[in-house]
């Protein structure tokens, strides 16, 4: 009982603090964009394992026996969790899904980071801010897709890059699932998978939920555009929703 109380107190401290600087180091490389350090990829299973081992974390999807997928309405998929997104053991480099918005924020805080706001997300995803961007990108140009002028850098339902999703054959009624973090080519500002792969939670509230950005493997490239503003209930944990973390750059 005493151990359980200590765990609850630790979680309380994480939630209350605006930004908790922990000694735990993330395995995800970061990219500096303006005044923020961005995780270059979406949150991975590897990093959630680090977090989970520290505080004996059990996600809501795990407690409920599985997360959700969409099949003419949301349905619970037994055994589908952040560790097993399609019901089978996954690679550590796959994006962590089946985590709700509050869980995503808690995980970011464990690494001394946070979820980005919608404004921060769109600025990093569409506005090229590097002083000397590589060929194909122009400083201060606002792009149609997070990958640039086209969605070819992304994993989506169709019309994007030539990538093979990792869902087992027959697991899904639509699409082929996500690819591992770091599989696709860098896009605007050198970030990966801001468009497609999995939706990403933000900290911005809208219509009783939270804005998610970037679309996922479930949709075509049209949903990756900045004008597509989607919000979802903060307590939902779905196979195609993940997240990435940011922190303020040290000056």
Predicted features along the sequence, with ranges:
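Extended beta-strand/loop cores of jelly-roll/beta-sandwich
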Residues: 2-7, 11-119, 124-128, 229-251
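Functional-site microenvironments in short loops/helix caps that host divalent-cation chemistry
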Residues: 76-97, 101-230
């Amino acid at each position: 009982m005493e151990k359980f109380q200590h765990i609850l107190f630790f979680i309380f401290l994480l939630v209350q603090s605006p930004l908790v600087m922990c000694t735990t180091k993330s395995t995800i490389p970061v990219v500096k964009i303006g005044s923020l350090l961005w995780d270059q990829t979406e949150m991975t299973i590897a990093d959630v394992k680090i977090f989970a081992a520290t505080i004996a974390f059990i996600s809501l999807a795990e407690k409920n026996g599985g997360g959700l997928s969409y099949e003419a309405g949301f349905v619970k998929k037994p055994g589908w969790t952040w560790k097993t997104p399609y019901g089978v053991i996954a690679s550590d480099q796959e994006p962590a899904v089946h985590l709700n918005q509050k869980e995503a924020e808690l995980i970011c805080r464990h690494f001394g980071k946070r979820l980005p706001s919608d404004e921060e997300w769109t600025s990093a995803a569409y506005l090229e801010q590097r002083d000397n961007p590589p060929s194909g990108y122009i400083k201060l140009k606002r792009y149609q897709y997070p990958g640039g002028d086209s969605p070819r850098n992304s994993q989506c339902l169709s019309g994007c890059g030539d990538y093979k999703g990792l869902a087992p054959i027959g697991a899904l009624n639509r699409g082929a699932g996500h690819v591992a973090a770091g599989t696709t080519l860098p896009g605007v500002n050198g970030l990966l998978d801001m468009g497609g792969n999995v939706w990403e939670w933000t900290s911005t509230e809208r219509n009783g939920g939270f804005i998610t950005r970037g679309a996922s493997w479930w949709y075509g490239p049209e949903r990756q555009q900045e004008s597509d503003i989607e919000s979802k209930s903060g307590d939902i944990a779905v196979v195609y929703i993940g997240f990435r973390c940011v922190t303020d750059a040290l000056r």
